């Protein structure tokens, strides 16, 4: 049943992305290993009866206390477990009572706003400039990084782009297919258009603009294959490490999503309305986008504190809560009144 869930049900019936399948598989594998160790039994002897509500709560507590996993990670794991057990209970009536218990488990409550990792425009430029446009690989990687930043797209959205999804005419834009096959169109900046025209001429010579070929690909043993998210992560790490020598603010390990976070933050800091930022990112709920407003406000608060000596009378009068999202000026900006 586990095999059918991951090999047939998720990819062929639910059309779940490879990234989500990997996440779900990792969760179920971790959970089964946890049950095995807690009950001191071989993996082959782990049964559905072991997956009680208490067991799941214990596993989530283990993630929180021993693995120091974030609330988001805990909830992702909980959602994966619920999805799997829902599938199982639809096919095995004897475990419905287990699913009923699991459904009652509450998700962990995150802080009102969690921190956002993002890079400055200088750091983004430093990473992009590590690519060598004189080589095929270097030029491809440069276009990839520029497009990732310009669109603020998720990794899977970038990987799914086909030639037919790109329009480089008077109103240049790209169509992205996000979570749940949700579609959105994102405008492209002229510098990005210039690079894309060169890239398509170089890597897709002879192909029509309406072709179904994936924009980014690699050639392995003479076979053309779509670029993988693992490859993109490697590319990010490679150029991130090189750029760190000239730009120390770049963290030791960077992930593709940091370009998305950075683009969103830069757009917000440049004055783009939060509703537009939300649409740009493809968020289904603007509350998800509020994290960027909070992060920017928190950054300003820290800058003010750093600029004010602790012994200063002014410093003593500063109240940090004044600069939270409840601030009237910020609220007016968030609601479009300013």
Regions found by a protein language model. Give the residues of each.
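Conserved catalytic core of the tyrosine transesterase superfamily
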Residues: 1-338
